[in-house]
Amino acid sequence: MAQVVLVFTTPIYWYGASGLTKTFIDRWSQSLRENREEFLAKFATKTAWVIGIGADEPRTKGLPLVQQFQHIFDFTGTKFAGYVLGKGNEPGDILQDAEALAAVEDIRSKWRL
């Protein structure tokens, strides 16, 4: 895995990650069974961000999602750089969330993307 920074994005479903995101992470178990030391050594060199979008008070009710990822990153030794929680339910809704967009722009400026 050549990437230095990992960005995990998910809609917030029932105060946690989507089923697809959770399944992706659950699949790591196979790698941990077969190549645990190598897998964890690679993740320990990474920095990760979390971006979650939800409709129902995401900046408060999305915090369990953030905490879940904090535990995942603690387990894998991955540096947790931060998170952005935005408000949206329909396609394009996030464009009305100035706070989330500003937070993402701040991250982008640090990466010079």
Where are these regions (language model features)?
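Helix-loop-strand module that forms the ligand-binding subsite of alpha/beta enzymes
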Residues: 1-74
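Glycine-rich phosphate/pyrophosphate-binding loop and the adjoining helix
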Residues: 59, 67-113
